[in-house]
Amino acid sequence: MVSPTVAALPSDNPESDMSVLHSLYGYGFVGVVIVSTLFLQFVGKEHWMYLTLFWAVPSIFASVLLFIAKLPDMNMEQDEVKTVNTKHRTKSLVLCVACIFLGACAENTMSNWISVYTENALNMPKVWGDIFGMSFFAIFLALTRTFYAKYGKNIYKVLTFSMIGAVVCYVIVAISPSAIISLIACVVVGICTSMLWPGTLILMEEKVPEVGVAAYALMAAGGDFGASFAPQTLGVIVDNVSVSEWAVNIGLVLSLTPEQVGFKFGMLIATIFPILGVILLAYMKKHFGQA
């Protein structure tokens, strides 16, 4: 609901507003990771239930703020008068939903697994993996969105180069023998994927005007599905590869455990999402060029 609300607000630069909105997610992510890591490290993991209660408080405050806020008038459905080509419009929305799905896959595969990956595949202590891996991932994700809000333009090129960058980073994470280089690549994924979710919303607003709240709901569903599907898929891949005989044999050659082989193979498979994203964006450029 927040995205269409912000989009409905009068603004001289709606792209900037959308980017700033989504940058707050990154800053919140950083806060949660650092506070939770320090709490579990110094207070004790046995007191985790108090941490859960603590993080329930911001949600309560957010609910109160949303309840008392004055919301702008929003277009709940598309305007038939302004709809020139319904078939083209519907296809455009489907393409945008597919794009945000792939973007969410690329972003959340790493954000969900970076802590476990640095601990198990790179043999780093969990506390350092959380702080230097997950936290820096979120910091750069937030800073990139903030930077785009101030200086960014040409969202199509941003999305395309972001997908390409994500492909490169995932490949480095998967095949690099250096733990430091792999960790840096994990963090840089945060930069590359930072604009994929908000950027697709911006692209939709530019190419499919007067979409209405329903379109934002579809976009949110596509993004949420990608954020769930990709990390779960990686988990299934890691579990199955780790117990395979060929993973044991490869591990003996590369001096890796079967689980480490599973993680690296999973990260290599994860490149399929940004690769498909590059192909999709190339098609979308042709599609919108015919509008």
Residue ranges and their predicted role:
Residues 89-143:
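Extracytoplasmic gate region of multi-pass secondary transporters
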Residues 1-11, 195-208:
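Intracellular juxtamembrane helix-capping segments at the cytosolic ends
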Residues 63-70, 268-291:
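Multi-pass alpha-helical transporter architecture, strongest
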Residues 12-74:
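Helix-loop-helix hairpin linking two adjacent transmembrane segments in secondary transporters
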Residues 2, 106-118, 200, 204, ...:
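Hydrophobic/aromatic end-of-helix segments at the C-terminal termini of transmembrane alpha-helices
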Residues 210-246:
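A late C-terminal transmembrane helix in Major Facilitator Superfamily
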Residues 155-203:
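C-terminal transmembrane helical hairpin of 12-TM major facilitator-type secondary transporters
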Residues 35-45, 118-119, 151-152, 234-246, ...:
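Interfacial helix-cap and linker-helix signal at transmembrane-aqueous boundaries
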